[in-house]
Amino acid sequence: MVEQLVERIQKKDLRAMSQLYQMYVEELSSVCYRYVPSDDDAKDVLQNSFVKIFTSMATFEYRDEPSFRGWLVKIVVNEALHFLQERKRLQFTDLHEATLLQMSDEEPEPDHITADELHQLISELPDGYRTVINLYVFEGYSHKKIAELLGIKEATSASQLYYAKQRLSRSIMKLINKKQ
């Protein structure tokens, strides 16, 4: 079904574009909100993403649904990163590599919080922390790839992840304590 939609979109079929939009808008909105929690900004980024998806479709070679989905997600992530960089909202803190090696990677067990609560806590992180944790945890990117995408050092990516986890850990503990 998806392959036929792609073929129809490549022939400029507006109904197929609408169907594809309806199929993926919810999932891609979730991806977008992980990076851009502001409602208006996220809607702009999502709209730009769909414009890019539809304009890039002419050269897209469909293989299978999972790779197509990955392509869609990659476009949304790149558009969100472009949005944040364009507005200079990504700020990064550098740590010396030796300091990074000494840091622990302990995380609390979030047994008592829901996925929605965790998503909310992540959305409250500063843009730089939130961006790196999303790229590393949800998109599965390495620090090297994150550094390339964001124009930062690998050590900076690692330190942002460390600080994001620390802050998230404190927020989770506060939430758990508040519930008890």
Regions found by a protein language model. Give the residues of each.
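Internal acidic/polar
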Residues: 2, 90-115
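Sigma70-family region 2
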Residues: 10-11, 50-65, 87
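Amphipathic, Lys/Arg- and hydrophobic-enriched alpha-helical face
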Residues: 21-39, 56, 122, 171-174
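Short, Lys/Arg-enriched C-terminal cap helix and immediately downstream tail that follows
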Residues: 130, 165-180
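Helix-turn-helix DNA-binding module
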Residues: 120-131, 139-156
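Structural recognition of an alpha-helix C-terminal capping motif at a helix-to-coil junction
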Residues: 30, 44-51, 66-78
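N-terminal module of bacterial RNA polymerase sigma factors
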Residues: 1-27, 144-145, 150, 177-180
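Arg/Lys-rich amphipathic alpha helix in sigma70-family domain 2
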Residues: 59, 73-94, 163
